[in-house]
Amino acid sequence: MAKESVKARNLKRQALVERYAAKRAKLKEAGDYLALDKLPKNASPVRVRNRCKITGRARGYMRKFGISRIVFREWAAQGKIPGVIKASW
């Protein structure tokens, strides 16, 4: 489990990215890199890390489900993810 402060920091970054997305796009299109540099650092989408919604784990993140591989495996075994079954052949 990631620390709550790390999860909160990432959520704060996501909110900043959403708030400045239109402004960033407009400045990029105009080529105004000086004004772009004045925006907050955390408003850049590259600073947001994909994290598991349950544990906050950053590695082994499955984008399609929004959870880590460990949580995915547990939930799939318990049948909590619709349409996901263990493979057998």
Curated annotation (Swiss-Prot):
<dbReference type="GO" id="GO:0019843">
    <property type="term" value="F:rRNA binding"/>
</dbReference>
<protein>
    <recommendedName>
        <fullName>Small ribosomal subunit protein uS14</fullName>
    </recommendedName>
</protein>
<keyword id="KW-0687">Ribonucleoprotein</keyword>
<dbReference type="InterPro" id="IPR023036">
    <property type="entry name" value="Ribosomal_uS14_bac/plastid"/>
</dbReference>
<dbReference type="InterPro" id="IPR001209">
    <property type="entry name" value="Ribosomal_uS14"/>
</dbReference>
<dbReference type="GO" id="GO:0006412">
    <property type="term" value="P:translation"/>
</dbReference>
<comment type="function">
    <text>Binds 16S rRNA, required for the assembly of 30S particles and may also be responsible for determining the conformation of the 16S rRNA at the A site.</text>
</comment>
<comment type="subunit">
    <text>Part of the 30S ribosomal subunit. Contacts proteins S3 and S10.</text>
</comment>
<comment type="similarity">
    <text>Belongs to the universal ribosomal protein uS14 family.</text>
</comment>
<dbReference type="Pfam" id="PF00253">
    <property type="entry name" value="Ribosomal_S14"/>
</dbReference>
<dbReference type="GO" id="GO:0003735">
    <property type="term" value="F:structural constituent of ribosome"/>
</dbReference>
<keyword id="KW-0689">Ribosomal protein</keyword>
<keyword id="KW-0694">RNA-binding</keyword>
<keyword id="KW-0699">rRNA-binding</keyword>
<dbReference type="InterPro" id="IPR043140">
    <property type="entry name" value="Ribosomal_uS14_sf"/>
</dbReference>
<dbReference type="GO" id="GO:0005737">
    <property type="term" value="C:cytoplasm"/>
</dbReference>
<dbReference type="GO" id="GO:0015935">
    <property type="term" value="C:small ribosomal subunit"/>
</dbReference>
<dbReference type="InterPro" id="IPR018271">
    <property type="entry name" value="Ribosomal_uS14_CS"/>
</dbReference>
